Amino acid sequence: HVGASLAIVGILMAVVQGGLAGRIIGALGEKKGLALGMLATTVAMAGYGLAPYGWMVYALLTVGALGGIAGPAAQAMITREVGADEQGAVQGALNSITSVAGIAGPLIWTWLFAVGIGADSQGRFPGLAFIGAAAVTLLGLVMAWRAMGNHKDPLDKDWGAKSVEQ
């Protein structure tokens, strides 16, 4: 099942990042696109952690793939907020954050998985790492939403009308 699920994830992510992300972000705007992507990831991770049957994970893969729109939406907003002379520094900082997360993430989530299945844990809960990931993603969504505040999203169809009225 692992090989099949990874193949499905790869296909779904290619579809989302290869074509749907731009369309969804274009329709919703960057801020709402980021929120949708992070919310989809939160729901999928919580679902993976709570799914009592393997087939349920397959059903959640589509929801999880929608999380792939968060990155492009965030990247677009961040890129627009800095001048051309700062783009390299910003992209370098984003890559550094991604690298640190790529190192720390597996250590944290492997440890949390071990806690969930460990002999000394009460009741054994192998989905603990996924619930933890859902919680961290939800926290990130709340923080991002607050940080964006009144972000002027040029892709948001309602933004132009609101800014004229103000």
Positions of PLM-derived features:
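Loop-to-transmembrane helix entry/capping segments in MFS-fold secondary transporters
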Residues: 82-96, 123
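A membrane-interface helix-boundary motif in multi-pass transporters
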Residues: 111-137
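Helix-to-loop junctions at the C-terminal end of transmembrane segments
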Residues: 15-30
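Loop-to-transmembrane helix entry
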Residues: 1-14, 125-127
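Helix-loop junctions at membrane interfaces in 12-TM secondary transporters
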Residues: 47-61, 70
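Structural signature of the two symmetry-related core transmembrane helices
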Residues: 32-47
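Intracellular juxtamembrane helix-capping segments at the cytosolic ends
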Residues: 69-83
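Multi-pass alpha-helical transporter architecture, strongest
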Residues: 131-166
